[in-house]
């Protein structure tokens, strides 16, 4: 169980985090939800390359502590094991980022787009795209991640269907 949330800063930078709990009861707890938001706010400001570096950063809400210290403190307050499972930060250099969180924090999506124009219409289109991504649960985030084996397999399926589809 747990939650994910996204924080977007100045339409250029976004971070998504997932924080796990043992039960859905805790995931609905306001203290836990505020902590997840604080972790996302930390992530959007972070330059950490990985989770270990992120956990050792000074906690923005109390620089005398690390992110790890803040997590341990929340575990003591909430009384249940918690884990910051993952985070991802996206920075748009030539465009913008938008986000969408579905199901009260079950799925989080960030879309980065290169565009010369950033206005409400562009943001609305990108938000609609983010909603579709959440609904479709894609296997890959970018073209670069798709293996040649997968592409070949999909091409075989399409080629096999092609003669049948020509008659329709």
Predicted region positions:
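N-terminal assembly/interaction segments in proteins that build large macromolecular machines
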Residues: 1-168
């Amino acid at each position: 169980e747990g939650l994910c949330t996204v924080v977007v800063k100045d339409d250029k930078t976004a971070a998504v985090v997932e924080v796990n709990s043992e039960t859905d009861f805790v995931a609905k707890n306001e203290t836990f939800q505020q902590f997840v938001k604080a972790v996302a706010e930390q992530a959007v400001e972070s330059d950490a390359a990985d989770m270990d570096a992120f956990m050792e950063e000074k906690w923005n809400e109390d620089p005398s502590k690390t992110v790890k210290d803040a997590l341990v403190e929340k575990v003591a307050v909430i009384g249940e094991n918690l884990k910051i499972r993952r985070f991802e930060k996206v920075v748009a250099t030539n465009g913008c980022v938008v986000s969408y969180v579905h199901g009260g924090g079950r799925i989080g999506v960030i879309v980065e787009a290169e565009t010369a124009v950033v206005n409400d219409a562009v943001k609305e289109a990108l938000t609609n795209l983010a909603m579709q991504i959440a609904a479709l649960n894609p296997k890959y985030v970018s073209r670069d991640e798709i293996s040649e084996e997968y592409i070949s397999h999909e091409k075989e399926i399409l080629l096999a269907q092609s003669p049948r589809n020509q008659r329709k």
